[in-house]
Every structure is written in C-alpha cells, then in structure tokens.
Amino acid sequence: MNSAYPAPGELFNLTGRIAVVTGAGRGIGEGIARALASAGATVVLAARRTVEIEEVAAQIRADGGEALAVTTDVTDDAAVDALARTAIAHFGSLSIWVNNAGGSPARMPMTQLSRQAWDECIALNQTAVWIGIVTAARYMATGSIINISSGAGSGPVPGSGHYGAAKAATNSLTQTASAKLAPRIRVNGIAPGAVPTEIFKKAMGIETTEELNAARKAWNIPMDRFGTPLDMGACAVFLCSDAAIWITGETIRVGGGAKPR
C-alpha cells in the first residue's frame, strides 16, 4: 500500500477544510452542513433566509464546530462571488463547495407551465449551480464540489418537466466540470430519493401525517423508510473526503433503492 495514502481512521476526517453549503438553513442543506461539521470541516452556511442559517450555525457552534452564516442569493453572480470572498476572508481558504440551494416546484404539465415559472425554476435549479461551480473554481486551489441533483434528472417524472430539465442539466454540468477542473478539483453529484423536507411535501401536495405515510408506501422503498437530510450529509462527507479521492464526474443516487417517481 502507498504509505502516502491516509490511514483508515483519517479517510473521512475533514478537519482543516473550509466548506460552503448553499441552501443550508433547512432540509437537505442543513443535513449536509451538520454532517460536514461533524466530520471536522468549518462550514459557511448560505441562504436567503438569514434567521434560518444563523440558527443552524449557532447549533453547529454549540456542538463544538465552527460555522458562519452568510445571507446570499445564489442566482446573483455578484452575491455568490461575495460569499466566496467572505469565506476566504474569515477562514483563509476554500476547499469544499456544495451547490444545494434549489426548489422543487409544484407539479404541473409542461403544456400548462408559464414562461415565468419555467425561468424561475431554471434560474434556481440550473443557473445557480453553474454560478456556484465557476465561482468555486475561481477561488479554490484544490478541493471538492458537490452538486445536488434529483432522480427527476435521470428520467421522466409526471408534472416535473421543468424541474427534471434543470436537474438533468445539473448532471451534465457535473460531468463537464469534472473533466475541466481535474485533477485540481473533483466534481460530483448527489441525487436524493424521497426525503420528506418541507419542499418535498409541498411539491407532492402532502399536508397530513396520513398522506405522508401513504406516500411512503406508494414509493415502495426497499429500505422501508424515507430518507433523511443526514443520509444525504453522510454521502457528502464521503465525496468530500480522501475516501473518494479517485471519484469525480459521478452523480450518486441516494434513494434507499427506490426508483425515481
């Protein structure tokens, strides 16, 4: 074995790495931020809702981690550039960037979709990922970029043509950026399965516990439960760690074995 390869106990250690996580105030973004912090990373949480990211940052610090909240509109090039510069000004470098911010709009047939709804979905779920990638590449010497995708990006999902198109583009951006930025920066994706965040429940029209339980059965998940934000966080830790040092250009589906729907 190469003596320079990390010892098994160090494979998932992210101590000393500075991570930016967008959309980190709740749901999957919060789960990823918490997981990275638990692995030792310093985390910069970005989102539009200042109160939410400040609360998560405070909780990470209370648990012994280091975190900073930065209010950011991920669809604004200048704001994202300022986010990167703020992270570096506070912590000296940048080594992990997670493009998580996004939204799953209410399901609607493509033929009934307004141009405004299409543009808003693409801006948040596709263009923002591109902005994040090019910004991270500008300021990151070496490191890892993770793009949060969706099962909707790999096949047709009724009523989600706009969202699926954006996530398919995200998968393509992951592959293209990985080839362009290697070997300096690794670029990978995570495609979450059914994780009942508030965004997920709104998109699926789920309002009650009974409806949520019915949805779980309908998804027919082999692992027999919904996913959690921390399930996605665990995958993010792996992809950012030295355990994934030879992995780039991949989008990993984390869905408990269920097919996209």
Regions found by a protein language model. Name each.
Residues 2-11, 104-107, 155, 219, ...:
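Short C-terminal tail/terminal secondary-structure segment
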Residues 18, 25-27:
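Conserved glycine-rich cofactor-binding loop
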Residues 50-51, 71-83, 115, 230-231:
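The beta1-alpha1 cofactor-binding region of Rossmann-like NAD(H)/NADP(H)-dependent oxidoreductases
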Residues 108-110, 114-122, 217:
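Substrate-binding pocket helix/loop in short-chain dehydrogenase/reductase
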Residues 133, 166, 174:
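Active-site helix of classical SDR
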Residues 138, 178-183, 245:
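Alpha-helical segment proximal to the catalytic Tyr-Lys
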Residues 150:
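Residue(s) in the substrate-gating loop at a strand-loop-helix junction
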